[in-house]
Amino acid sequence: MTLLELKNVSKCYTGTKPALSDVSFSVKEGEFVSVIGASGSGKTTLLRCINRMIEPSGGEISFNGIMVSKLRKSGLRKVRTKIGMVFQHHNLVERLTVIENVLHGRLGYKSTLAGVLGIYNSREKKQAYEILEILGILDLMHKRCDQISGGQKQRVGIARALVQNPKMILCDEPIASLDPGSSKIIMDYLKNICSDRGITLIISLHQVNVALNYSHRIIGFNKGTIHFDGPPSRLSPGRITEIYGAEQITESYEHSLAEAAG
């Protein structure tokens, strides 16, 4: 079943070339989709248009049968409860504890007063504890977020998205600032979330080999337009060159391509 559909979506910033130009694609429930491309290719703009953190300049976006691009404030807030977001730079409140940051994922379901006072019921707290345990950071729940590592912060961000009970999670360069070991941990967790929970993931990445290893599907962007959309097995060296505008093929890419091909 189609969960997300974009039709002719564009985004123009004043005084610049279009960040997105006539972008159209659909995503099925349970898909793991990686969006690759060079810096400035439109990956982050795409993700932020999907949940309307920024407003598209044109086109239509529908999610779960609802036309997101036409929603007003209350309707958009409701839809956003089902679209989690994981940020490159975590977007946590550093002075608050891990568990407090995770429970912020429930704010979309709360009244303004309950949100300000931090009122959460026992079911919400139990769910947060269970997710932290799955992500291997339950022992950090009472630590302030300025006292934990970058990889641990990213797991907090994932936990915050999961307590929303989302149908889809958007991940904006979630491993860009992490070392290889931490990157693998994060990607493994994201893959398990997709396969075990059936949550759709759309993740922007620079690393071609990571996209090849983890994705059901890859979408390649260059200057705001789609230059590739298909399974990892079809992503050829020529396509990589087309997407990035320069030779990007390495031994790790060739090894990953062989793995993706089975």
Q: Each PLM stretch: what is its role?
A:
Residues 67, 110, 114-139:
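Conserved ABC ATPase "signature" region
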Residues 144-148, 152:
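Conserved ABC ATPase signature
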Residues 165:
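Conserved catalytic motifs of ABC-family nucleotide-binding domains
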